[in-house]
Amino acid sequence: DDNRHLLKPPVGNQQVYKGNDDFIVMVVGGPNSRKDYHYDEGEEFFYQLEGDIILKIIEDGKPKDIEIKEGEIFLLPARTPHSPQRGANTVGLVMEVNRRPGMQDRLQWYCEKCNNLLHEGFLELKDIETELKAAMETFYASTDLRTCKVKECGAVMEPPVKLA
């Protein structure tokens, strides 16, 4: 409760145990406003403390929604693109494996009209609280990156609604 004010969009995360060698342990609160999909080489553990969330994933090239209800846990398999959608007053605990040197995370954006991969950014993640947000800002600042290159489509992804 003392740190709820730190859970700010677009991601809403706050690392709990900094300096831990093995795990990134975060509390993540809603609402968030995300259109990106995070791709992690390791598994991610979700424990939903308050409220229900939708974890959007890409499975076999197609979008799929997984509901994680309050009190439930979910282990996301490694290398599964995912986009947590958190409503207001939701709080969850998320654990990820700390990145080893050379490991790269990815942020992916898919066309909202045809599901084509619009852009994939690579990060050697050192500070999860700041680097995800910076990569998102770079993507949304570029109309070219947000424009679908499929000739029959050409849709332009609008940036997500900014939340306070």
Question: Predicted regions span which residues?
Answer:
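Jelly-roll (double-stranded beta-helix
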Residues: 1-47, 52-73, 81-164
